Amino acid sequence: MLFRSNGGGKTTLAKIIMGLVQPTSGQIFYNGEDITGLSITERAKKGISYGFQQPPRFKGITVHALLLLAAGEEKLSKDRCCSYLTKVGLCANDYLDREVDVSLSGGEVKRIEIATILARHSDLMIFDEPEAGIDLWSFARLTETFEQIHQEGKATMIIISHQERIIRLADEIVVIANGQIAHRGNTEEVFPLILADTLGGCPVIERKEASL
């Protein structure tokens, strides 16, 4: 999906999908099921995860404990927890025992949140500007992780991003203007419009066969 500019409703739409915001009209279908009336918890149980633009902090909870909590019934070994942190560009040994509190930068908290989403093995992962506040090396590592998920084809990703490298991963881009679909097509068709600065920042969908 792609919107014309900042303030166009990218984050609002993502939150509606997750159930954080209620739609004023219309319905939300996920894998052919109407989930409009489902709670956040019910949507999460169906395999939908959401990464905030500004993730919350959890004083008193360590990164290790948060990853274990995210994994649910799956018993994560310490090595598995470390691997998820590595995928988002963090040195695991430096973070596992740290609390998710104000001592961490915004970029660090964002990457930790992304790691928890990876640990959940969600069917639908929604990321709101995952590159915000992240250094170039970590961004490259994170992009490699997104590319790997995309290639495996086991999950759908909706990524709100202004970064060309992430946008190019999209299978399909839908441009919405004034509440209507203005353009819809594959990346090769729509991406030149972005390069020409005809359109603004965009959420990107990378999807498997399951429809949203």
Label the predicted regions.
Residues G26-E33, K46, R80:
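Conserved ABC transporter NBD signature motif
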Residues D34-S49, I194:
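ABC ATPase NBD coupling module
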Residues E129-P130:
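Walker B catalytic motif
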Residues M18:
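Helix-to-loop junction immediately C-terminal to a conserved catalytic motif
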